[in-house]
């Protein structure tokens, strides 16, 4: 949140759904996910958020916890680039560490550019369910 990039749990989405709508090459800024990272994030989050009333999560700064989890993930999890074409889609676990790789100079895309539609539906449950559900 903000210019200091403070981490706060403002959205409790169920998953991330990516749907490519244009054609582009594999190195055109692919989605990157760290395999198994959701388990590490869940461990760190459970340890931290169990001390806080779920109604207060949205205002709690968990930046330090997030960075500690992320550092462990970078050290222990395999980085995987995800590529899909129109007609395909992918789902990412809500707690998986993910990002977008830089555009490779050799990458190509259709005239419309690289367009992927992302959906992050809310998890319509009690806040603590976000932490305890698989």
Q: Where in the sequence are the language-model features?
A:
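Extracellular structured ligand-interaction cores
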Residues: 12-18, 28, 79-81, 97, ...
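Double-stranded beta-helix
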Residues: 24-91
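Short, well-ordered beta-to-alpha junction loops that form the rim of enzyme active sites
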Residues: 20, 36, 94-96
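Generic detector of leucine side chains in alpha-helical contexts
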Residues: 6-9, 17, 31, 41, ...
């Amino acid at each position: 949140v903000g210019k200091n990039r403070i981490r706060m749990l403002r959205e409790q989405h169920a998953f991330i759904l990516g749907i490519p709508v244009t054609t582009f090459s594999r190195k055109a800024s692919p989605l990157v996910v760290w395999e198994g990272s959701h388990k590490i994030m869940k461990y760190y989050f459970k340890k931290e958020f169990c001390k806080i009333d779920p109604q207060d999560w949205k205002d709690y700064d968990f930046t330090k916890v997030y960075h500690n989890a992320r550092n462990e993930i970078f050290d222990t999890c395999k980085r995987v680039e995800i590529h899909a074409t129109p007609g395909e889609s992918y789902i990412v676990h809500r707690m998986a560490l993910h990002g977008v790789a830089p555009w490779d100079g050799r990458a190509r895309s259709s005239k419309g550019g690289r367009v992927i539609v992302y959906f992050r539906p809310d998890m319509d449950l009690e806040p603590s369910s976000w932490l305890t559900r698989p």
